[in-house]
Amino acid sequence: MALIDEIRQKIEAEQFEFSKHAVDQSIIRRINVQETRELFGDAEVIEDYPEDKYGPSCLILGKTREGRPLHIQCSYPSRPLIKIITLYEPDPDLWIDFRIRRTS
């Protein structure tokens, strides 16, 4: 099973939690839990961080039902609960099609 499919399966089963940082950022950036769930429907892994210092994680791009693009960094599904590390609306000045980081 693909990484995104395993993550999606855990999200749908409510097997996820937010880091304190993600909770703080969701309040500041006005991203609610429902939007977080919605974006996994057509989500894709755009960056992979297998050697992340706190454990393997990846950056996911998805869109809410309203079409709002969001990035979520989360742990691999090998954990009992997926940890949502951070989430934000990507800046189009920093991303090409919200998928590829622009270089200077």
Model-derived features: where do they sit?
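Ribonuclease/tRNase effector modules and their secretory precursors
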Residues: 1-104
